[in-house]
């Protein structure tokens, strides 16, 4: 899904360095505190103790939750300590399986009755019209007659949010710029009632086959599957009513699905993803008509992949942030350490496992005002 990675010039690297306090060695600590002691007469031991305590906590959390030091440093900047502990516990806890009803073939109520008849315990997702939570099942949930018949798709609850924010309408022309494996594409199709046209694009030819398979099983007939580099898609086709960019990311919000994320991601990985995301969001904006809508989402909770990408788009294209229409979630950051963002950044939405019982997600909704590019 992600295009071949390229080395970034130092001028283009985003700033996500750890603070000097976090990175200071013993000699740096001593020198810094000694200077402060000379100036204000305070006891350097108390300050060293506080720093040492924070470092020990960081090391303990890394050990307990299998994070590398870099990743834990980022998380400690995002959350107060007690909330960070709740986030880490929730992130390590398997959540119930979620499925999305395919309303092209059935109703959620009818699907629930079918599954209950098989001894499967389900409940509706209270903020979604299509979602069902599967608590336990005596049969493989991906091998029932209802599944094979296209009555539902396995899809995390958080993955429903970007399409809900997109709010596609019948007969529209919509682009899903990074579409594989097709969960969001088929969700868009059912909300459009199989009318209009969807262009489902992905850079990976292999993953395009997954889009095709899901469309076929779910009965989606209004979708054209494309195998192009999303960064250049605007050179091929424009004028879409709406564009969804569920961008490739580090996956920090879904570490339970890929625990290696916690131990292997580095500063360079974050920089590469952020750079790619910035290229993709400009292409997405250039693909949509004036007055059209772009929804940007990631399954990452890192600032550099979310608010920083939206801020980049605001500075280079004539777009504005608008309400997502989502009834829950935390506001995006208006300021964070040295970063100062547009006041409307609070209209973006952040989702966390410990607060919302979903995967970590970010959703932003933009409206295009003009095709002119900012310089």
Specify the residue positions occupied by each region the protein language model found.
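S-adenosylmethionine
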Residues: 1-375
